[in-house]
Regions:
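Alpha-helical segment of the N-proximal tetratricopeptide repeat
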Residues: 45-79, 96
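Register position in tetratricopeptide repeats
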Residues: 62, 96-97, 130-131, 166, ...
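Structural marker of alpha-solenoid helical repeat scaffolds
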Residues: 45, 79, 113-114, 147-149, ...
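Terminal, low-structured helical/coil segments at or just beyond the last alpha-helical repeat
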Residues: 28-46, 218-267
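Helix-start (N-cap) detector for alpha-helical repeat units in TPR-like alpha-solenoids
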Residues: 50, 84-85, 118-119, 152-154, ...
Length: 267
């Protein structure tokens, strides 16, 4: 089944690892919907109705309204239990509300319905990597980026690179990240992970240069600040190290990276 453009756009937004986080679910009642989101049309055939609710659920997901996203996607799945995208995207939402067994079930069902779907393979690979099953995830990213109908293979290469890093496969990570950058030049997420490759190889000057270039274009999160702090420490730049430590403390006091700093666990 050829993936539609809207699903490719959703995957482009939400599936890049370790860098961009979704807004937490809103606490408002489920009927409190943004005024600018249209009410889905109600055509007669189930597939069109399921697609409309899936698209709407994906929009709420992008907006961080996970409660309403789940409602729309569950409705889509009930209307057409054979519409794979509804289950694939619902799996992502279920991951973000920490319903991991239910997310796994949805991804498996989506793959049973359409095992070649590049979006579902990429989504499931991402889920596996995020739940400490990175070694299993690589094959699903490969199924995604090798599929000629996939509109955003750069995302699957990026995710594969990040997951190779998680399991210490540095050469494979670099290869995947460079392939992602060839398709999506100057992508900050790919550049961040490539800086991590440089760091792990001991190329601290290259890592520092790349990180500073990325920070000049995007607002850094705790992961990037932490990697740059460790790089400056390796280079003996104590003033820059202390400045970055202050930024972590002020901006991200609850982050895992700041907790590592407090424990002086630099590696």
């Amino acid at each position: 089944m050829v993936a539609s453009k809207w699903l490719a756009r959703v995957c482009a937004v939400v599936l890049c690892l370790g860098f961009v986080s979704l807004t937490e679910a809103q606490s408002q009642p489920s009927e409190d919907r943004p005024a600018n989101v249209p009410t889905p049309p109600q055509p007669k055939d189930p597939r069109t109705r399921a697609k409309a609710h899936t698209e709407l659920g994906a929009l709420y997901f992008q907006d961080g309204n996970l409660i309403v996203a789940l409602e729309e996607l569950t409705l889509a799945a009930a209307i057409d239990p054979e519409y794979a995208p509804a289950f694939s995207i619902r799996g992502l939402v279920l991951y973000h509300v920490k319903e991991f067994p239910s997310a796994e079930k949805d991804f498996q069902h989506a793959l049973d319905l359409d095992e070649r779907s590049p979006e579902t393979n990429n989504n499931y690979g991402w889920f596996l990597c995020q739940t400490d099953r990175a070694a299993e995830s690589i094959q699903y990213f490969a199924r995604a980026y090798e599929n000629p109908v996939y509109q955003t293979p750069a995302n699957a290469y990026l995710n594969a690179g990040a997951c190779h890093l998680k399991i210490g496969e540095i050469d494979q990570a670099e290869d995947a990240l460079r392939k992602s950058l060839r398709l999506m030049p100057d992508n900050p997420q790919a550049l961040y992970h490539l800086a991590d490759v440089h760091y792990r190889r001991g190329n601290f000057d290259a890592a520092r240069k790349q990180l500073i270039e990325v920070i000049g274009r995007v607002e850094p999160g705790p992961e990037m600040l932490w990697l740059l702090l460790r790089t400056e420490r390796r280079l003996g730049n104590r003033g820059d190290e202390q400045s970055l430590a202050t930024q972590l403390r002020r901006r991200f006091p609850d982050s895992a990276e700041y907790q590592e700093l407090l424990r002086e666990n630099y590696e």
